[in-house]
Amino acid sequence: MTANQTCGQAAIALLETHGVDTVFGIPGVHTLEFYRGLAGSRIRHVAVRHEQGAGFMADGYARASGRPGVCLVITGPGLTNAATAIGQAYSDSVPMLVLSSVNARDDLGKGRGRLHEITSQQAAMAPLTAFSRTIA
């Protein structure tokens, strides 16, 4: 990460470094930095109408290509909307990477009623994934 990059931009640069060529998602207020990173990358973005669609498209991409499917979703309901696809990919051992934004670090786990807040996205996804972490 350079001094001028946000975490979202650095995440996209890292995906590109590892050969990711396609991501699925919906731009939203919480994922703007991912999309700022996409603008300067060679990664193709497939816009979807619903996060569940992003998850199933990433799953299908992985099954067809043999490469991990990647989706970008917003915090809270964006992540939970993708949960069915995430669980399906996990149960079938399909490689999928889901990048979800979170609210501000100081708000995590506080129950302050922030936009799209979930107490712990990491805990919500733990039963559906092989690895779930919050990086804030």
Regions found by a protein language model. Name each.
Residues 1-136:
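N-terminal alpha/beta PP-like core and its mobile active-site loop of ThDP/TPP-dependent enzymes
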